[in-house]
Structure formats: C-alpha cells, structure tokens
A protein has these predicted regions:
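Mature extracellular or lumenal effector domains of secreted proteins
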Residues: 1-218
Length: 218
C-alpha cells in the first residue's frame, strides 16, 4: 500500500444559503456571504440562537498536533481547543447546526509536496445525543482521496470512556482517538498527530485509508 503524509481541512458547506444582514451568522458561510473578502480566521457563529455564540476558525483543521484529541466524552460533547488553532467544535454544536440547515461535507487534503485530494459528500448530518450523535453521510464524490467515510455512516460517536461502536473492542481506546467508529475505522481524523508514516502503527494516526492507499493525514 502507498502511504502519504497529508494535511486535512474539514469544511461544512450549507446546501441552503441564508444569512441576512443584521441576522447573527449560523455558520462560516453566513460570514463570507456578508463579506466575501474576509480571510480565514476566528469568527463567532450562533448555531443555537442569537444568545449563544461559539467561536470557530473558518476553516478548521488539524495543523500542528499541539492539541490533545484523546479526550473523554464530555469534551467531545461540548467542544475544546482554541478557535485560532486546533479545535473540536463539539457534537452538540454540530447537531444544532444540522437542525438549522442541510449540509455537505468536504474533506480536503494536501501533503507537504503539494499533492492534493478530496472527498465530498452531498449530505452530512449529526443526530441528537439520545441517539449517540449518530452520523449520516451520503452522496460521495471522489476527488482522488477515495471513500473512507462511507463505512462510518449510521454509526454512533465513541470515546474511550463511552464505547458505542459495533466492534467487540473499544476502538477509541485501541486507536487513541474518538470518532464514529464501526469495526473500527477507515478514517481516524481525531487520532494521534504524527510527522510522517509509521508503518504498522499508522492506524493510530490521523488517517484516511482508501482502497489501494493508506493516507496518514497530518
């Protein structure tokens, strides 16, 4: 299998465009609709209502491994990190965003040699906590990265202290991450940030595994 070190950018793209002047932005698209000259950076969005603001970095990504993503359920539920660096928005915030609008998901990758690939999904949503923040993702378009997320469709979110995968093992504990694991994963974006390929232990890293390729996302 081929292995490559990749940088990943995860982008939620609204299918239905909103954002009227004077209305608090629900997500990053509202901010850029108001002024498309704004650079990537820290902004406040209001996924629940105009009294509850959440700082986000548009576009969020794993950048340098400075933030520990091996965390318990409560952190993943509410969110953690810094809006001007690495960040996890929070499962509840993702759920509230998906209640308000329909979204696409773009997984965009580029290695340190400038090679680019992406995977796009025309429908992305996260269910409520009572359903384990279940992932719904369909409508795959291949931009060279392959479909590493399809097998995770319909799965509940798991952390090492809240195992909700369908494996007999605790996938989050085994692969040092947190995700919508199945048995266990074809992608592990919240895994260990590593500099380069590490052969047999690649599965614990920030990985996008496709047919014929094993891409380690940095």
């Amino acid at each position: 299998m081929q292995r490559a070190a990749l940088l990943s950018v995860l982008v939620l793209v609204p299918q239905l465009v909103g954002g009227l002047p004077g209305v608090p932005p629900v997500d990053c698209s509202d901010i850029y609709q108001q002024d498309n000259s704004r650079p990537s950076g820290v902004y406040t969005v209001y996924p629940v209502g105009d009294t509850y603001g959440v700082q986000v970095f548009c576009l969020p990504e794993r950048t340098d491994g400075s933030l520990n993503f091996y965390r318990p359920w409560d952190y993943y539920r509410t969110g953690f990190g810094s809006a001007d660096g690495e960040i996890w928005l929070g499962l509840e915030n993702l759920f509230q965003l998906c209640l308000r609008r329909k979204y696409e998901l773009l997984v965009d990758m580029e290695d340190f040699e400038g090679n680019k690939a992406y995977a796009r999904y025309s429908s992305f949503s996260v269910g409520p906590e009572v359903e384990g923040y279940k992932l719904e993702v369909t409508g795959f378009t291949d931009g060279g990265a392959g479909d590493s997320l399809g097998s995770h469709n319909g799965m509940k979110f798991s952390t090492f202290d809240k195992d909700q995968d369908v494996s007999s093992q605790n996938c989050a504990e085994l692969y040092l991450g947190a995700f919508w694991y199945e048995r266990c994963h074809n992608t592990n974006p919240n895994g260990v940030y590593r500099w380069g390929s590490y052969g047999s232990i690649s599965a614990i890293g920030v990985e996008w595994d496709t047919s014929g390729k094993d891409m380690t996302i940095l």
